[in-house]
Every structure is written in C-alpha cells, then in structure tokens.
Amino acid sequence: MKIVALLIVFISLYAGGSMQRCQSYVQEVRRAHWSQFGVDYPYQYGVGQLVQESGCRNILSLDGVGSEGLSQITYRLWQKPLKAKGVEGIKSIPDQLKAQAIIMRSVWVSKYGLWATYQVYNGGGLVLKEINRAGVDDWEKAKDQCKRGQSCFTYKGIKTCRSNCDINYEYSQNIFKYGGQYGTVKESSQYRYW
C-alpha cells in the first residue's frame, strides 16, 4: 500500500512539474508554429507534443538514434531541410522549437487531420499508407489497417515489448489530450485534429 501511495505522489509531482516546465515554452511554441502555419494553427498541440516527447526536458534520448531536446529531433536526419530554413543546430531551445515547427510543416498533409501529421512526426509515413488502405481519414479505421512489428525495451533487466501500432496511434491521442491543457484550442477546417 505504501508503494502505491508513493507511486501516486511521484506521478502527480512529475505531471505537475511537466505542466509548469511546458507552460514556460507556450509562447515560443506559438511563435514558431505560427511562423510556419499561420495564426490559425492550434499551437497548443505543439506544446502537447513536447509533453509527450520529453516532458519538456532538454534531454538526449536513449532511443539509440540520437533524438535530442524538448521535441526529440534526430538532427542528423533533418539537418539538410533544417539548414535550408536557417536552423544550423538544435542545441538551443529556440532552435529546437523552430525545428519542431519546420518539421511539422514539412510532414503536414493538408487533406488529413492533424492527428496524422503528429503520427508521421512520431513514426514516419506508414500512417499515410494505413489511411489509404482504410480508404478514409479516420483514426480508428486507419489503426485497423496497421500491420507493424513490435518494439522491445529492457529496463532493469526486464524486457517489455509493445506493438508499434499501439505506440504510434496512442501518440496522436496523447498530443490531443496534452495540447488541451495549454489554452483553448481554436480549431478550424484548415487545421482540424480528427
């Protein structure tokens, strides 16, 4: 029982700390996303993405591919398009947030909801193939078409495996949930989420 109580306290402290940390980046995320998408873009989802990616911590991931910063960008993969847009590196937080918005703009497919764009950012273009197989821009129907492998992780000697479909499709749900915590999301037909 004590362990459960301590776990609840830890989770609530972590979540509260994440909320405060992320709040300090809201205006920078807004500026970065509006510079790429225009002022109708619901930038709150960009903040939600930082919550999902790093808990708004400027960290180097242990993912094995070199993802770094608040938005967990693998710079070596995005170096050329980012440099073309004036981002020479992502060591500074302002550059990380600019890079996040630039990447989001480059993977955005305007005929689909933003959920698909966030999933492309997270897991590549497979979601676009799943939408095509489903024949409709619908999260649930696209997920039904998902046929991916698993990712396995070992932590403290315990191996855990998860479906890559579950990981990628939960990602867009989390962005939606977390984004709503950073102000009223003003959706438009141009930038609908679902």
Would you name each region that the model predicts?
Residues 42-45, 68:
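Extracytoplasmic
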Residues 3-13:
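Sec-dependent N-terminal signal peptides
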